[in-house]
């Protein structure tokens, strides 16, 4: 049975007296660094010169090039995009690790798929908040928290689990609760959720619904409202109380249509396709494709991105959002 750990579950403060280097100062980086600092820990930031470097300094941190930050630290939390972690690790982190250090991540991709292979004499652990960095920070300041996952890949010192739990508490996550997992489980479930449901699945579902209505002769604007704009109403209900809250809140007509038509759209074949997606994640095919495309300058990735940005639903949405000043519209720079 899944066990949840809270503040009172962390009996030993294994971070006490250790210097923590946060590598990266983006969404998660700023939240981890500030929460740990507010909890009294010795935190420095390692990052290359640029906007984030300046922002970390403005926020009161001692900021260093990555290599120097690693040299100074006992615990190194890597909070960089997946695609650049490998090179930064090889060139700036690995040469400066010492026996007994702890190397940490908020996502297991590069460890699980062996893009990064740490030496045997360092601890390797995971603390993965289940929410974006701005929410991790905001809830911490408010006295609550975002739940998180934690796990240990390598325990060189015999203290890796204690350190990971202490780190989770340090960023505030144990206020809400943390669940123990493995790098394998966190990575594979996270990638599957993104690809089959949250990003790949939902985007394709919305596009297909839009195309179906437009091809049948309905106005593009109405199609947009029905299959994309109103999605937020449903997701908010689901977020607050699950699918049963959606069905409680919608009309009987909508609920009946849910039961009789949902299975016609998401057929057993779709579930079989999901299983195939999961298999490609588990066997490393997806990771290999992503890593190779990254090494090739992301040619396929950028081509696919451009194709999707050109979909008709995007142009319709941009115009309709001008009619709704209550929406905090975000213009995406291409």
UniProtKB/Swiss-Prot annotation:
This entry's Gene Ontology molecular function terms read: ketol-acid reductoisomerase activity; magnesium ion binding; NADP binding
| The reaction(s) this protein catalyses | (2R)-2,3-dihydroxy-3-methylbutanoate + NADP(+) = (2S)-2-acetolactate + NADPH + H(+); (2R,3R)-2,3-dihydroxy-3-methylpentanoate + NADP(+) = (S)-2-ethyl-2-hydroxy-3-oxobutanoate + NADPH + H(+)
Name the positions where NADP(+) binds.
Answer: 25-28, 48, 52, 82-85, 133
**UniProt-listed Pfam families:** KARI_C, KARI_N
Q: Which cofactor does it need?
A: Mg(2+)
Gene Ontology biological-process entries: isoleucine biosynthetic process; L-valine biosynthetic process
- State where Mg(2+) 1 binds: 190, 194
| Keyword Amino-acid biosynthesis assigned | yes
Q: Where does Mg(2+) 2 bind?
A: 190, 226, 230
Active-site feature positions = 107
Q: Which InterPro entries match?
A: 6-PGluconate_DH-like_C_sf, KARI, KARI_C, KARI_N, KARI_prok, NAD(P)-bd_dom_sf
List, for all copies, the residue spans of the domain called KARI N-terminal Rossmann: 2-181
Q: Which PROSITE patterns match?
A: KARI_C, KARI_N
This one is known as: Ketol-acid reductoisomerase (NADP(+))
> Which gene is the coding source of this polypeptide chain?
ilvC
